[in-house]
Curated annotation (Swiss-Prot):
PROSITE patterns named in the record: ACETATE_KINASE_1, ACETATE_KINASE_2
Organism listed in the record: Buchnera aphidicola subsp. Baizongia pistaciae (strain Bp)
Pathway(s) it belongs to: Metabolic intermediate biosynthesis; acetyl-CoA biosynthesis; acetyl-CoA from acetate: step 1/2
Reaction(s) catalysed by this chain's protein: acetate + ATP = acetyl phosphate + ADP
Compartment annotation: Cytoplasm
Binding site for Mg(2+): 10, 387
Protein name as catalogued: Acetate kinase
Signal peptide limits: none
SUPFAM superfamilies listed in its UniProt record: Actin-like ATPase domain (SSF53067)
Co-factor note (free text): Mg(2+). Can also accept Mn(2+).
Length: 400
């Protein structure tokens, strides 16, 4: 007999994660991922109990196709699971000015998420596709769809940290300020760090490095976020797969006036053609870059720049907690799996008494969790991201 289940749709800019989680003990009944969307190949991978399934389509398919395949093929073929879905939880990257906590999705909420698309142009439109698809395939659950926002976690950031030094009216009238992202992942890292470090949540001071196709670093003081690297949009901060991260704003004006590039073209360059892809000239996928770190000068430069900027943010955030840090967390696809990135970054922080256990660091990947620091030095943790657990808990909380 199945307990009530929540279907979780985590629609990202380059992948689509899905899972079905039980309401009683949050065990996963089904999970999967769709990768390489909008390229020449689409790969479906899913797991039910201990059985694994893979389907590869050597043709570019739309996001709509992927969503419909998940909902009408993979899920419907598992009738015991499909028939016990009680609600649908959606990761939504940006809540905009008005949405800073999880909510049941209504037409009004859809409008507010749509209004926030300008803050997250890569993500919110895709998140809305997930909502639309679940409404179409699961119409009986239309009033039991829940939006869980990445920006909610960062709503505790103080005003002096989230404002930009531009005329104040732009904040008051248009909501131009720092909002952050990766908040759901950070929320899980905070909860899990508290358990692993055996420190009360309300006393916990940590720095969380969520490193994937998108990358950010956040500092948590007394259990709540007090600053983060991403800003008004997920473009600010660290170097990312295809995003530039921090640049001098005048670069935009220079490219517009001197190179005669339109604002929309520049926007596309900074979001889709920069970062690791732009620097390396090879790929935005870290898995394709890491193996050539020592043999390709441009790839080495890209990775070194990525690590340099991250180490600067970490050392700067140490001052926010006045040096009273309980640990650094690496999470996200790169954070969890790249021993190279962790090694380079931590080597730059040795003066702060951060030291890696090289042997353990090399082995820490593929879903493993734990400490990778040398004994009696600052704790360094690898915590696999589990946004789905947070979304499940928030979704059940909202419908109940």
């Amino acid at each position: 007999m199945f307990n009530k289940l929540v279907l979780i749709l985590n629609c990202g800019s380059s992948s689509l994660k899905f899972s079905v989680v039980s309401s009683d003990n949050y065990t996963t009944k089904l999970s999967g991922i769709v990768e390489f969307l909008n390229l020449s190949q689409i790969r479906f991978f899913w797991k039910i109990k201990k059985k694994e399934y893979v389907r590869v389509i050597n043709k570019s398919k739309s996001y709509d196709y992927a969503l419909n395949y998940i909902l009408t093929k993979i899920l419907k073929e598992e009738s015991k699971i499909f028939n016990n879905i009680a609600c649908v939880g959606h990761r939504v990257v940006h809540g905009g000015v008005n949405l800073n906590k999880s909510v049941l999705i209504t037409q009004e909420i859809i409008k507010l998420i749509t209004d926030a698309c300008s803050f997250a142009p890569l993500h919110n439109p895709i998140n809305l596709l997930g909502i639309k698809a679940s409404h179409a395939v699961l119409p009986h659950l239309k009033e039991k769809n829940v939006a869980v926002f990445d920006t909610s976690f960062h709503s505790s950031i103080p005003k002096f940290a989230y404002l930009y030094a531009i005329p104040y009216k732009f904040y008051k009238k248009f909501g131009i300020r720092k909002y952050g992202a990766h908040g759901i992942s950070c929320q899980y890292s905070v909860c899990r760090s508290s358990e692993l470090l055996q420190i009360e949540l309300t006393s916990l001071n940590i720095i969380i490095c969520h490193l994937g196709g998108g990358a950010s670093v956040s500092v948590v003081k007394n259990g709540v976020c007090v600053d983060t690297s991403m800003g008004l949009t997920p473009l600010e901060g660290l170097i990312m797969g295809t995003r530039s991260g921090d640049i001098d704003p005048s670069v935009i004006f220079f490219m517009n006036k001197q190179l005669n590039l339109s604002i929309s073209t520049i926007n596309n360059i900074l979001i889709n053609k920069s970062g690791l892809l732009g620097l390396s000239g090879v790929s935005s996928d870290f898995r394709n870059l890491e193996s050539e770190y020592n043999s390709n000068i441009r790839i080495k430069l890209a990775i070194d720049m990525f690590c340099y900027r991250l180490s600067k943010y970490i050392s700067g955030y140490m001052s926010v907690v006045k040096g009273k840090l309980h640990g650094i967390v690496f999470t996200g696809g790169i954070g969890e799996n790249s021993s190279l990135v962790r090694s380079i970054v931590i080597s730059k922080l040795a003066f702060l008494n951060f030291k890696l256990n090289s042997d353990i660091n090399m082995l820490m990947k593929s879903g493993k969790e734990g400490f990778i620091n040398i004994k009696n030095t600052f704790p360094i943790l690898v915590i696999p991201a589990n946004e789905e657990l947070i979304i499940a808990k928030e979704s059940f909380s909202e419908i109940n």
